[in-house]
């Protein structure tokens, strides 16, 4: 999977992909492994969109701390892999969120964070798939971009979308699907697809708000990879 992602230390690029696995087949463990490899490869910002519920987000945050970060983001005590080999503090990934706190609005005023990323310690963020939370995250990234007088955040970013089929890819129709009430004439027959099958014409659709929010996050980085995980594509 990592080989298909954007090169975090290469030229500006954007890649998108999907991983499909059966229910309870280890998808979370798979993307935690991908995150670890991505950090080794040089990714500087790692965002996990962990479902719609806070309980799911909390569970994902805990597993991330135990499997990758090595410390509890609240009290900085060693957990999981951190009990076997504790990194020096400057190499511990920085958690913007913790098991008790999603990405909140007050974080948007702190524009110092991303400018202090070291050569070896990425920033990790675990958020709910919630419009308000995603807006807060987008506003924070905008503040960092403007504070550094940049059109785009000059860092490599990996976005993991858990349960990617839920809301992330939703579209809304710009036009009503009006089926003809009378038999079509020869000229009208040519337009049948547009009238009856608007799903085949992407220009007739707009992204829903969550879909658009995820797109906004991806556009803010010069190097980004989106990987959606799902059991029901």
Task: Cite the ranges covered by each PLM segment.
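RecA-like P-loop NTPase motor core of helicase/translocase proteins
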Residues: 1-233
């Amino acid at each position: 999977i990592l080989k298909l992602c954007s090169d975090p230390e290469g030229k500006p690029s954007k890649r998108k992909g999907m991983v499909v696995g059966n229910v309870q087949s280890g998808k979370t463990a798979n993307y935690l492994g991908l995150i670890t490899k991505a950090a080794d490869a040089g990714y500087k910002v790692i965002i996990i969109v962990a479902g719609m519920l806070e309980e799911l987000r909390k569970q994902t945050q805990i597993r991330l701390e135990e499997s990758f970060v090595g410390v509890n983001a609240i009290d900085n005590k060693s957990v999981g892999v951190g009990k076997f080999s504790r990194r020096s503090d400057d190499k511990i990934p920085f958690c913007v969120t913790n098991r008790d706190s999603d990405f909140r609005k007050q974080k948007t005023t702190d524009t110092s964070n991303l400018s202090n990323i070291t050569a070896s310690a990425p920033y990790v963020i675990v958020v709910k798939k919630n419009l308000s939370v995603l807006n807060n995250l987008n506003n924070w990234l905008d503040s960092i971009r403007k504070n550094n007088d940049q059109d785009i955040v000059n860092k490599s970013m990996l976005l993991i979308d858990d349960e990617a089929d839920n809301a992330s890819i939703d579209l809304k129709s710009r036009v009503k699907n009006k089926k003809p009430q009378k038999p079509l004439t020869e000229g009208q027959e040519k337009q049948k697809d547009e009238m009856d099958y608007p799903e085949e014409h992407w220009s007739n659709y707009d992204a829903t708000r969550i879909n658009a929010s995820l797109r906004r996050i991806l556009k803010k980085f010069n190097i980004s990879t989106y990987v959606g995980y799902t059991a029901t594509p």
